[in-house]
């Protein structure tokens, strides 16, 4: 049953919304996360209104004091929101009116909820981007420090999840450092498109009042205002960029967690995770499960979904504002909270894990990952590489049938294969030698890994 419409926008209506319809349209359950930013935006707006003589300095001071009181109450957890006021903007105006009286109604002069909500979201995301960039810097530092400790730790390098060539564990970690550095660069670029003020665009066409958009932008800490009022209220690209960047970040974290999950299994035993980041089983007493790594891997799905959700919302929206845009917030909030916690979890998990360097190195001696070394050895002595590749492949087949490895083959047998092979072949086949010799730029050679780490430390 409908009643008389008492909404702040209700002048044009004869009846109010049914309660269940009102609840469907309300967003206060989630957009209250914007409360602090809504108040800060309003403080900047009313300061400008007073400075420009659009409202009296006395009224501006009264409104500003009321807003500052509400901000303190919000930070103290004392504000209560009402679903009948729909969203954070109407709730704040209602609370302000209750605090200072009808003069609160002057706050909305030369402003619409359209530019107001866009401003709130720019402020929120700008703050979150700073937090994400800082946490990424911490994770990258953890990786560099861990890599520095394990420059000389040898592990199997993989292709197709099969042993390929021995590499430095530090080199492996630095590959992830590079991924997370690119993530950081993307978020830093994201700041550029977030650092714009929509305030003053009003509903879509600007306003007849002599406002100063540069002033409010400066008061809120933005680089500049949007140059087009339609774009200002309808643009959500900055959120889509954030969700896209977050999806790539989660993909990188998921890939790393997948490896950590494998490394701490009985089959690998490369690392041991701290109890802080592990859980047990309700039935199997022996279990120590890498749940936090699995959760990061799993949560990548929800972050991807948030990106696709907003892309779908935006794909057919005409200019300028549409109620569909209410659906831009929950995914943004969820993604921001997910990646900030995941970054802390991954950094903590990596910094506290124990690396079984001896077992890592031993695993490179129980495979044929030194096969390329033998082929390169022959090629370096003048044999065409393709011929060397063929010879080594046949020798591996022979070794596989006889149950031994290349380093176990007697010199006499080697010399029946090629008189180019001498005693020094055994040094070549050692994993440490194989890694050390790969000194091409960006390679896994120890000096190259040290150089990568030194460059990373400069960047950090």
UniProtKB/Swiss-Prot annotation:
Enzymatic reactions: 2-(N(omega)-L-arginino)succinate = fumarate + L-arginine
Main location: cytoplasm
Subcellular localization(s) per the UniProt record: Cytoplasm
Gene Ontology terms: cellular component: cytosol
CDD domains to which the protein is assigned, alphabetical: Argininosuccinate_lyase (cd01359)
E.C. number(s) listed in UniProt: 4.3.2.1
GO biological process per UniProt: arginine biosynthetic process via ornithine; L-arginine biosynthetic process
GO molecular function: argininosuccinate lyase activity
InterPro entries per the UniProt record, alphabetical: Arg_succ_lyase_C, Argininosuccinate_lyase, Fumarase/histidase_N, Fumarate_lyase_CS, Fumarate_lyase_fam, Fumarate_lyase_N, L-Aspartase-like
Protein name: Argininosuccinate lyase
Gene (UniProt): argH
